[in-house]
Amino acid sequence: MITHDPQLLALRALTAPLLGTEEPLTHLNEISLSAQGAAVCGHVLIDLLEENDLAIGDYEVVIAPEGDGALAAAMIHAAGGRGLDLDAALLRPTQATASDASFTGAPIHGRPAVLLANSSLVDTGALREAVEAAGATVVGVISLLPDPSTQDFARESGLTYCAPSLAD
């Protein structure tokens, strides 16, 4: 897909080296924990949600596994740069059931949420179940790195799925 969006072009340039690796997720923190990368990632993720009719306000909190905390923080900062409020919560790893899940960060009970899921290693269904057991309502799913299993989950659940097109 051809684009002239400077944020998406910058993201493509940043992710190009890691997309050629066998384990792109292991290198994702190299991008999301850099000043330039965090700014670009946060704006691209929020823009994608807006392009799919999910504006901040339609969701109040982004919820992610602990490993995606840097991306959740990037979204908070991008929202703040736009004069908008966005909170985040992280799911702590657990071996227990969804009803025993533990979150750190902003309160999620009674709030509309977007799930940030970047890996087929994350069971998006279990993440959603834990979020809903904690009282939040999931309104969409977003990934920085496109993931077919997460996309399938979102489609089967009737949720909006967003991921950037990282190919030229």
Identify the role of each PLM range.
Residues 1-168:
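PRPP-associated nucleotide enzymes
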